[in-house]
Amino acid sequence: MNFRYNQTPFGYQRRKTREVKVGDVKVGGNNPIVIQSMINSDTTDTQGSVKQILELERAGCEIVRLTVPSQADADNLPSIRQELKKAGSKVPLVADIHFTPSVAMKAVEYVEKVRINPGNFADKKKFAVRDYTDLEYNQELERISEVFSPLVLRCKELGVSMRIGTNHGSLSDRIMNRYGDTPQGMVESALEFIRIAESLGYYDIIVSMKASNPQVMVQAYRMLASRFNELKMDYPLHLGVTEAGDGNDGRIKSAIGIGSLLEDGLGDTIRVSLTEDPVLEVPVAKLLADKFNKKISNLNSVKGYSEFRNPFSYNRFYSSEIKIVQFEAGENHPVRVETILPFENSNSFLENVAKLYQYGKSLSIEPESILVDSPLPDQLKEISEAATALSIPVGILLSKNVSLNEKLQKELLSFPKIVFDPFLQFQDGEKMLSFLKERQNAGLFSEIHTSGDKLDSLRGLPDTLSEIGIKNVLFSLDSKEILYDYRKLGSILSRFEFPILLHGSFSNPEEALYNSAIGIGGLLIDGIGDLIRISTSKIKDIEEIFQLSYDLLQGTRLRLTKTEYISCPSCGRTLFDLQETTARIKSRTGHLKGVKIAVMGCIVNGPGEMADADFGYVGAGPGKVHLYRGKEIVLKNVPSEIADEKLVQLIKDNGLWQDPSND
């Protein structure tokens, strides 16, 4: 299989795409990344829709989408256009179409772009299981062409662009039966429609591969880019994690998916889907886009590194086990979290640890490992004594200006793990190896931690360690280019079993949230990393960073430490107040660690985008809700006033309920 989906995974270069115009906005080519959002007003409500569109435009949104589910909605588009013209608005509009080709033919006359979902534009979801012969499959494609071609020709005639937007949760029965519920199925679904459009000489196309799981979403976009390379296609990509949710969780998932793809040079326009006021999506999208609009190509230091991943499938990078008393990491253990704390004296240190435990208790999480940040050598004895009061390992991060003399090496034998830079702390390589051997013989671990610009100098060290039998070593980096440099480290270590700790040091919690989600999150979804360690320079941020670390693991779906919510951002199809409903359900179920609950406004993507959710709450009509167990409806048309209670009872009936703690 050809794993190439971009110029290189080890440096930045934006993928070259054709330019597609959406009204006066240019997407792709050499243009900046374009920011989009979607209103959640009913499209038949002219004033409500216009108000939201203008608010988004003022916030910096460059393209606005609105749902057009019925003929009545399409008929109201001229009124919306007229009011926008009066207000002096020039923002291009996108009509979002599902199930209704006839409505698309009307809507195309009043918008700059049409979005169609290849999973339901010409197909009705029946969840039928059948094997298609090649002849039957081609007959299905001919049927689709008959339904889709009139819209393509009308778009071509009017100069209207189109997004062919695949959703992981709404693949057609035909695709599901041939390719399964997979990234490959998502890609082939879009390609079927692209080929039809191309056969009619239409190329003003933008493509998306959305999923609520960032891992699936990233794999699908990479596979699409790889297939585009094979087929000599250069269509721009619209990036988004659908149903990302709200608050920090929604922002983390979006940054993992969108940000890591932008790092790979993929993406020409983005939408951050939050279950919040649409205006609040824009600053998040701008933050992500600005980072990459300012980024210049950098392929200077990529030679000598080779791809060691399957970028289209999750496979954890295998490493040997780290075992310190009850602490276990690496091998098949969950990704662990290490917390950095300062040390002034025993009392303040133990007080900070106690606060961390207390905060962790409120999250139903216990701290797992502590690293003392750059203590003075004469503090080591006091730290060692304080650590005896704790049941978790306490390691030492050596200050860069500390030289590892023999006296200090002996004192460090009191600590289960130390972190040092081999290029700063040892002048003599033989002495370093002797030191590592001594620690291993004592059952202790050492973390080799250096800067990303020293990677070339690090290349021969794993071979040397293996040759002399040193195994109790893990590797980490201090880098501003977390994703690229850790991929380089992964390439160096791919023949070995040394564990990798993903380290990120940031100036404040907001920077930590976005950049750790992009860098560390982007690595985790590829199976790279056995531990993570995120820090800022301020002790007051410790609790926030502690929670961020576990939220990041939750966002990658690698470790669930709280209830997982999949909730759509709401649109004109939504049949209830989604933000209020989501908040209400969270208040009832937020203590159910590891349970996945989907809250969906309507049935368009609801059942499918619930993906691997355990339970679903999906709008079925005004004042009515369907409740799901997995993808199966178990209660239909439940009155919304009792739906919350019925959901709780459904969770209880399936043995996944536990009463909230009184702590």
Swiss-Prot record:
Main EC class the enzyme belongs to: oxidoreductase
Enzyme Commission code(s) on record: 1.17.7.3
Pathway involvement of the protein, from the record: Isoprenoid biosynthesis; isopentenyl diphosphate biosynthesis via DXP pathway; isopentenyl diphosphate from 1-deoxy-D-xylulose 5-phosphate: step 5/6
A GO biological process held by the record: isopentenyl diphosphate biosynthetic process, methylerythritol 4-phosphate pathway
Pfam families hit by this protein: GcpE
Any GO molecular function: 4-hydroxy-3-methylbut-2-en-1-yl diphosphate synthase activity (ferredoxin)
Entry keyword set: 4Fe-4S, Iron, Iron-sulfur, Isoprene biosynthesis, Metal-binding, Oxidoreductase
Cofactor(s) recorded in Swiss-Prot or TrEMBL: [4Fe-4S] cluster
Binding-site list for [4Fe-4S] cluster: 568, 571, 602, 609
The record's free-text note on cofactor binding: Binds 1 [4Fe-4S] cluster.
Keyword NADP among UniProt keywords: no
Catalysed transformations (reactions): (2E)-4-hydroxy-3-methylbut-2-enyl diphosphate + oxidized [flavodoxin] + H2O + 2 H(+) = 2-C-methyl-D-erythritol 2,4-cyclic diphosphate + reduced [flavodoxin]
Summary of the function given for this chain in its UniProt record: Converts 2C-methyl-D-erythritol 2,4-cyclodiphosphate (ME-2,4cPP) into 1-hydroxy-2-methyl-2-(E)-butenyl 4-diphosphate.
Family as reported in the entry's similarity comment: Belongs to the IspG family.
Protein name: 4-hydroxy-3-methylbut-2-en-1-yl diphosphate synthase (flavodoxin)
Organism: Leptospira interrogans serogroup Icterohaemorrhagiae serovar Lai (strain 56601)
Higher taxonomy: Bacteria, Pseudomonadati, Spirochaetota, Spirochaetia, Leptospirales
The encoding gene: ispG
